[in-house]
């Protein structure tokens, strides 16, 4: 799929219907789904053949959306200002009011989060009403996908 506004809107429709898609990041491709949806999150675990005990990472577009789900402190904010967006993962305490699927975290009280730097993924995240659960787009224990063709080869028409 080419990266244009029409296809970003198409990706949003897939995600809104609890489907999973491949998304580019500045490191590897991610297998993405609505982090608030148990249905989408279950699909990610199933497609990846990932153990449910291995929590997923969640991608956010900005701090205000993150603050809906996680507690932030000055230490985090200083690191955020220095390193984000980019290839760094933070682990933050979830708020009780968070809508993040408990399946994402294996019912733990913390969440691994990122702010990806890839322009296409950021455009998509900005038009969504939810963050994306998006671990690497590969079967668990296999090499991570670094190109769109790798994702298509790995998952075919399942996403």
Give, region by region, the residue ranges found by the protein language model.
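Active-site-adjacent structural elements in enzyme catalytic cores
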Residues: 1-159
